[in-house]
Amino acid sequence: MKTMKVTQIKSGAHRLKSHKACLMGLGLRRIGHTVEVEDTPSTRGMVNRINYMVKVEEA
């Protein structure tokens, strides 16, 4: 299955609870942290919701 690399580039502090939940759901903990996740509709939805806080690369 396809994967994508997601890197957190902005802090999760003082954000909406749903946006913090998306960060936790993707496994992102701090600025500069990168995770590799499967490219599924659910992960795409989380990434789209917090697109201003993350950078996405196709892996």
Curated annotation (Swiss-Prot):
Superkingdom, natural source: Bacteria
Gene3D superfamilies for the chain: Ribosomal protein L30, ferredoxin-like fold domain (3.30.1390.20)
One Pfam family matching this protein: Ribosomal_L30
Gene Ontology CC: cytosolic large ribosomal subunit
GO biological process: translation
Annotated SUPFAM superfamilies: Ribosomal protein L30p/L7e
UniProt keyword terms in alphabetical order: Ribonucleoprotein, Ribosomal protein
GO MF term list: structural constituent of ribosome
Intrachain S-S bonds: none
Subunit architecture: Part of the 50S ribosomal subunit.
Family: Belongs to the universal ribosomal protein uL30 family.
Protein name: Large ribosomal subunit protein uL30
Source organism of the structure: Psychrobacter sp. (strain PRwf-1)
